[in-house]
């Protein structure tokens, strides 16, 4: 089973430093979700390599692999130079994730050229996975909205599992006794 992971960029959820407590909480929450998916038979986790939820998930997947879970990480980057605007720390994290991934490639083997690419990228990701774990609130104005809407459209005509995580669920996780 191949699971696509998508979600917020750090700035979309008020995260501006990697050592903020919110990052620790999100990673613990993501780890719990990953373990649920592994228990249900997930073998591959797919990300595009965007900062925030995707790279947090990648870090947790790598930790789980180091703990001998039999899972794989695929990084399907959207196009060449998609990470040009990443700061030095994010560039280093992406390079570490790519080095530890089991598969990495570009969906488009060229730099960005037109907005239509994103629609094709989303379609490619969805049609090559069995389900998605998406961190997204309807009220939030986030880039992941486009992926989420594409998944909804696809799942209307095809068997595709989608789990959408909203802020309420993360807050419940914190309230239930998450303690770092």
What kind of region is each of these model predictions?
Residues 3-179:
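Acidic/glycine-enriched connector segments
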């Amino acid at each position: 089973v191949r699971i696509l992971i998508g979600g917020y960029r750090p700035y979309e959820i008020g995260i501006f430093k990697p050592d903020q407590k919110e990052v620790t909480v999100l990673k613990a929450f993501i780890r719990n979700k990953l373990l649920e998916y592994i228990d249900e038979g997930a073998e591959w986790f797919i990300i595009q390599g965007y900062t925030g939820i995707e790279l947090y998930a990648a870090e947790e997947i790598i930790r789980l692999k180091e703990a001998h879970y039999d899972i794989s990480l695929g990084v399907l980057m959207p196009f060449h130079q998609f990470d040009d605007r990443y700061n030095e720390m994010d560039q280093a994290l992406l390079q570490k994730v790519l080095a530890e991934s089991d598969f990495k490639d570009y969906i488009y083997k060229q730099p960005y050229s037109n907005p239509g690419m994103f629609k094709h990228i989303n379609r490619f990701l969805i049609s090559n996975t069995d389900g998605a774990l998406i961190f997204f609130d309807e009220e939030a104005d986030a880039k992941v909205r486009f992926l989420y809407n594409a998944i909804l459209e696809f799942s209307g005509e095809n068997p595709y599992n989608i789990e959408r995580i909203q802020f309420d669920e993360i807050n419940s996780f914190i309230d239930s006794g998450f303690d770092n």
